[in-house]
Amino acid sequence: MTERIFRYLREQQPETPCLVIDLDVVENNFRRMRELLPAAHIFYAVKANPAAQILARLANLGSKFDTASRGEIEMVQQTGVSMDRVSFGNTIKKEKDIAWAYQQGVRLFAFDSEAELQKLARVAPGARVFCRVLVDCGGAEWPLSKKFGCAPEMAKDLLRKAKDWGLDAYGISFHVGSQQTDLEQWDRALAQVSQMFFALAEAGVDLRMVNLGGGFPARYRAEVSSIDAYCEAVGRALVRHFGNRMPEVIMEPGRSMVGDAGVIQSEVVLVSRKAANDRKRWVYLDIGKFSG
């Protein structure tokens, strides 16, 4: 908890539950990532915390935005940023939402299936598209290795089709899992992705972007490596696998940008036992989903 948050809670004594964010911490996290990986484009993952004040602060700092829904795009629009700073990064979208986003000026879209690619070809002609591939998520607290992404061979086939169908086959994305504790997972993923780049180039599909996704952990109670260590590991992996053929780089930090910036203050509503001889106590807070 920062001194500013502590002072606010002490002086204002807000009704609970109350979430307080120190925007200076968010800004410092952004600036540090940009300093450590200056060539990377930072797309803040809006789903991590879409509070208007956070989006506005990041917009003023030059951040771009990774969005997963029409609602998130509309939140970003409220900051006044141009839509060329927005990625529609969800690989599962309604066709009408793709069409709407395209009309608003969004030109960067994710996909991981032929059906999704067909939607993009129909209602977002000429858009830049990137395919999400499946990678190893070992070491992550929340693996994302099944629901999103496709096998590398399928991804190569889809990117060839993207070019044939009038889309801009822009690049490849991956996600090593949320709260990833193994720094080497980005190296393993980039080894796989770089080979896809080179194979597609030989087939006449010149990709230009690699999206590192998120996964950079926030520090809660358990200790994790510093963001410096993560960014240095990613930088080494990029050089190792792409050398002088370096593509554009996108990263999508979410909780690592905001997770350590706030505190939720709650109240203990009830402490009880379920039987006279029960030694376990149940502690109920006013922040529970079902009011307890």
Sequence positions of predicted segments:
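Conserved anion-binding
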Residues: 112-168
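Alpha-helix N-cap and loop-to-helix initiation/capping positions
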Residues: 21, 93, 115, 143-154, ...
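A charged N-terminal "starter" segment
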Residues: 1-127, 164, 168, 202, ...
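Active-site-proximal beta-alpha loop/turn segments in soluble metabolic enzymes
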Residues: 55, 102, 134-147, 171-185, ...
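C-terminal active-site-proximal or functional interface alpha/beta core segments in diverse enzymes
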Residues: 185-292
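Active-site-proximal loop/turn and secondary-structure-junction residues that shape catalytic pockets
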Residues: 25, 48-50, 71-72, 92-94, ...
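Structural preference for beta-strand elements that scaffold enzyme active sites
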Residues: 41-43, 64, 83-87, 108, ...
